[in-house]
């Protein structure tokens, strides 16, 4: 089952969707681009959800750290 969060504290990220069973994170950026990240541990996802700056957390802990693909 996926959980979806609207991101309020970021100029980069709009929404995230996380599937704990599959450990996939789908990130929707404010410009409309969507990427899917694979093998993302649940603690990384929740860190993103509670971060003071979701964009900074994403850049430090997710971007270029996990395999990903652009969602068309």
Predicted regions and their residues:
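Acidic/histidine-enriched, beta-strand-rich ligand/metal-binding domains
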Residues: 2-72
């Amino acid at each position: 089952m996926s959980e979806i969060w609207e991101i309020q504290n970021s100029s980069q990220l709009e929404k995230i969707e996380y599937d704990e069973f599959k450990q996939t994170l789908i990130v929707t950026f404010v410009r409309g681009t969507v990427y899917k990240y694979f093998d993302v541990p649940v603690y990384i996802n929740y860190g993103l959800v509670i971060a003071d700056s979701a964009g900074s957390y994403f850049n430090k802990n997710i971007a270029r750290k996990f395999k990903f693909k652009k969602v068309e």
